[in-house]
From Swiss-Prot:
GO terms for biological process: lipid metabolic process. GO terms for molecular function: acyl-CoA (8-3)-desaturase activity; heme binding; metal ion binding. Residues 16-100 form the Cytochrome b5 heme-binding domain. May play a role in muscle cell metabolism. Muscle. This is Cytochrome b5-related protein. Heme binds at residues 59, 82. GO terms for cellular component: mitochondrion. The gene is Cyt-b5-r. Pfam families: Cyt-b5, FA_desaturase. Keywords: Heme, Iron, Metal-binding. It comes from Drosophila melanogaster (Fruit fly). PROSITE patterns: CYTOCHROME_B5_1, CYTOCHROME_B5_2.
Amino acid sequence: MVIEEWKKSGIATKFPTYRNSALITTHSWQKGKRQDDGAEGLWRINDGIYDFTSFIDKHPGGPFWIRETKGTDITEAFEAHHLTTAPEKMIAKYKVRDAAEPRIYTLTLEEGGFYKTLKERVREQLKTIDKRPKKKSDLIHLGLVVSLYLLGIASAKYNSLLALVLASVALCWTVIVSHNYFHRRDNWQMYAFNLGMMNFAAWRVSHALSHHIYPNSYFDLELSMFEPLLCWVPNPHIKSKLMRYVSWVTEPVAYALAFFIQMGTRIFYSLRHTNILYWHDLLPLTIPIAIYLGTGGSLGIWICVRQWLAMTSIASFSFCLIGLNAAHHDPEIYHEGDANREDRDWGLFQVDTIIDRGDLKWSQFLVLTHFGDHVLHHLFPTLDHGLLPALYPVLYQTLDEFKGHLRECNHIEHMIGQHKQLLRIEPNPRAPGAGK
């Protein structure tokens, strides 16, 4: 099959099937991946086919990760989510055969390569670093959850615009900090992510299994789900000249409605296709209920709902303002269509798709609430953000050895770069690591 030139992926031998779907969702991405990956209805790691059916309920990280990845290639996800060597040894007994077809993904995870070298050094470093910042992360998360409810009640009770804005920011930050938790084994903190009308289970697919593994590529749901309103791929076949400039106008509207769109899309898809809703999609309703009860029921249900919707809209805008200007969109970093570096190591690919927020590193609170330390988070997503600063020495050492470069900027610079990327349609001909 001949692939049209503009559909050729820099990290795979085929164009992802899910991008042909009329409505792009986590379910359509999973369905397409099962068609594309050559996993033969089971689980694929490198060139082996594994049957983890009997292991689903035994998985220490929870059954979700195994159940939802059945029928797909989990090579990179398996590597990034397991820091110890025990899982690699354990899976041998679940192998049933070699794969019939070669992998479609062209990124590598070779012994002695960048990622495996860094991973070994990080494994050693973790034996001696201070673990107390992890407890601080837990306290920050708990404090934000409590404050969003208290401020939400105060905003309604005293009709305070200031309290409303503060409650909205607290909701936004709660959602972002909760993202620190859904990459890991099941825990109560991950449920707080749903307070913003999004869903941690859906984001475990769209964010952890799609965006984290294939950032800024055709396989990245966090690119495709915003199209055509916002399009960062430098490709005129995907973004028209009109949409390049209209996106600057639609952007603030998309920001304010993003949380509602996520919920609405899941409801629509569940009614028309396959159910992708969970019981914990009801958790956002605890906010207007808390406001109603906290004001003694004196304000009426409609006022409480109105206050909640206003909180959610402001939080949605804030979330997008932070999240879409946090790490991934700038003309200087790799997007699908740009030239690839010669070394196809998956870890280096992660570094090439990220520009970190250098202005956040002095504060654990800001790192947690603004997607900071992003390169290390992509490379080791199961580690608490509070532990990441201690890993910079080995990261810099390994980057130097493999000709990698950690890019940094502040928030304003990133916002400017992100808008330049929305306009860019010409691929970057110079590969990362190629020198001047």
